[in-house]
């Protein structure tokens, strides 16, 4: 009779050893509570995915959000991050600072949340694969999570039939050389991604 009572605390302790602890440190302009809840709910799905591949048990994410792009660019200059003059992306992940930085929320709440999911995915990939993960994998996973929504059934990707057809057509017409694409460096990959 005592054995089950003695084993129960051991079972709980072992469960805690396996628990994933992810802390998000918010900085910059304040986010509404609803956005924080959405981010934390979404991140739980990302963490469950990346845990399968060796994501550390305890992890701190730094998320720096700016409402205004101009303030974000000034901040980047102050921390010695220099972007090209015509840089159009709405967010970056800085491996040097280990921080996701959102460069303005002018495009609205839904779009900025998608960018946050994208940039935090870069952090997870680097935690697993180190400083130089393959560009196609790093960007591919980030793009995947950027285009997902949380539903009652879990995470659902918003990949449209048009996008599926376009990729299939590009491959069938030989517009994509998958071997070269997989082996391309960051610069070449990013150039191809823009097309």
Give each language-model segment a name.
Residues 4-14:
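Sec-dependent N-terminal signal peptides
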Residues 20-134:
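Juxtacatalytic substrate-recognition/specificity segment
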């Amino acid at each position: 009779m005592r054995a089950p009572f003695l084993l129960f605390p051991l079972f709980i302790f072992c469960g805690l050893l396996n628990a994933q602890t992810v802390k998000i440190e918010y900085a910059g302009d304040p986010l509404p509570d609803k956005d924080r809840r959405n981010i934390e709910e979404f991140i739980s799905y990302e963490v469950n995915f990346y845990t399968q591949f060796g994501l550390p048990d305890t992890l701190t994410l730094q998320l720096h959000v700016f409402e205004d792009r101009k303030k974000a660019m000034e901040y980047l200059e102050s921390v010695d991050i220099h972007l090209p003059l015509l840089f159009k992306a709405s967010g970056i992940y800085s491996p040097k600072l280990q921080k996701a930085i959102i460069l303005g929320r002018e495009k609205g709440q839904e779009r900025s949340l998608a960018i946050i999911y994208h940039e935090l995915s870069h952090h997870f990939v680097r935690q697993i694969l180190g400083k130089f993960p393959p560009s196609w994998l790093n960007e591919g996973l980030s793009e995947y999570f950027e285009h997902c929504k949380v539903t009652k059934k879990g995470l659902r990707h918003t990949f449209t039939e048009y996008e599926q057809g376009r990729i299939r057509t590009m491959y069938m017409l030989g517009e994509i050389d998958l071997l070269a694409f997989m082996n391309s460096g960051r610069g070449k990959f990013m150039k191809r991604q823009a097309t």
